[in-house]
Design a protein with these regions (language model features):
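ATP-dependent adenylation/nucleotidyltransferase module used to activate substrates
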Residues: 2-241
């Protein structure tokens, strides 16, 4: 029954009941809209897979990830102002994130250095290295050249401080002569019969190549862009051996 009384209804009409029915519906719509927004900024739509079951937007997820990276570096003194950091870069997503984050740390250090009057704390250096593994994975020279050019473009597009890119063949672990090194590398790899053993050997040679180059060129920190899946594989593999 409709009520048109301006002084308030004293009869048993359904006006209040109708208002009660509307209120929960409005709240439900509001709650649904909030659930479709980023839990941090409350402004953008969440991105699937961007942390905490996809509840963050891309910008907030990136900001949160960088904050954790910076906290881990600062809390454990992984990078100090006097360090020279070598980033192992493959071009994959993990190494790209590692390079970008350490670049942003270096940028912040550079801004603090420029703003300080005494300039007592130097800015840590950053270099980038790419390991050429064509001695193990034979690919056309044009493909590896294109890949190296793409990596050079990625590194050069980073804002200052400038970072030097180094390209080292994996066989350089044996000797400085490319021909002799490649021959010795092939001989060693061919001596391992199973595929898993060859992959393990390649991993060890890759790490030795990176460590050798870092020590010979003044780098005292080596940064690897390893994802959690790769680390988990290494742990499981080492456990069952």
């Amino acid at each position: 029954m409709a009520c048109n009384s301006a002084t308030g209804c004293q009869s048993g009409c359904y006006k209040n009941e109708f208002e009660r029915d509307l209120k929960p519906a409005t709240e439900t719509i509001s709650d649904s809209n909030e659930q479709n927004l980023c839990v941090k900024c409350k402004a953008n739509e969440p991105t699937p897979g961007a942390g905490e079951d996809g509840k963050h937007c891309l910008d907030c997820f990136r900001s949160n990830l960088f904050g954790k990276f910076r906290l881990a570096v600062a809390s454990n003194a992984l990078i100090t102002p006097a360090d020279n950091v070598l980033v192992a870069f493959s071009g994959g997503p993990s190494s790209r994130v590692a390079l970008q984050f350490v670049h942003e740390l270096q940028q912040r250090a550079q801004k603090n250095f420029d703003a300080s009057k005494d300039r007592s704390l130097p800015v840590f250096g950053v270099g980038v290295v790419f390991v050429d593994e064509t001695a193990y994975y034979p690919v056309p020279s044009s493909e590896i050249d294109n890949a190296i050019q793409e990596i050079k473009l990625i590194v050069s597009n980073l804002s200052p401080p400038t970072k030097e890119l180094h390209v080292i063949p994996i066989e350089s672990i044996f000797c400085s002569n490319p021909c002799d090194g490649r021959e010795r590398f092939k001989k060693l790899v061919d001596s391992v019969s199973d595929a898993t053993g060859k992959e393990d050997l390649l991993l060890q040679l890759r790490m030795l190549s990176l460590q050798k180059f870092a020590s010979e060129n003044g780098y005292n920190r080596l940064l690897l862009g390893l994802c959690t899946s790769r680390i988990a594989c290494h742990v499981i593999t080492a456990t069952v051996k």
